């Protein structure tokens, strides 16, 4: 620690030494849901639709066709290296849609080049390259139904934050077994040091004259697939 910083902290401690003792933080909030699974999933669906996301139900047998429909016939889209390949359309160069597979990037920034479906080994896409991509398809870590919030934490099936912020269209897969009701339940499933991105609907802001503008801080289109892996 520098001498200047140490001096600043010393003065702060000295100035606040005689201050009042803070009241203890109340932690009597709910930590576990009492609702059944169907209620929790419906709560998440209602919240996401209210936030102007589209929501559809799929199984592992139908999810690839659903993603193909959502992307359209000519999309150029990026997927993280760890996403289940069986969930994706069987796209190849010259077949209309083009899939770009990004390498896995750990929390420390360490890169592991991977061989994509048809792209060979590649480095992570630059921001300029991502700006030329139509969409991104990822999975998710956990979703909080109470707030309608999807958590991404940089896992191999979600990729780094940039790929979910720059493209204008995000197709996000939410496995039903990852849906919880309460925020404390969601945080309990998140690695403490993970880079967390929380998504509650398409990107939108009303900062200027309270007029809603979409797509300022991320994708303006969010399609959520509630994936039932038990069927």
Predicted features and spans:
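The feature marks the mature, well-folded catalytic cores of soluble enzymes
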Residues: 1-231
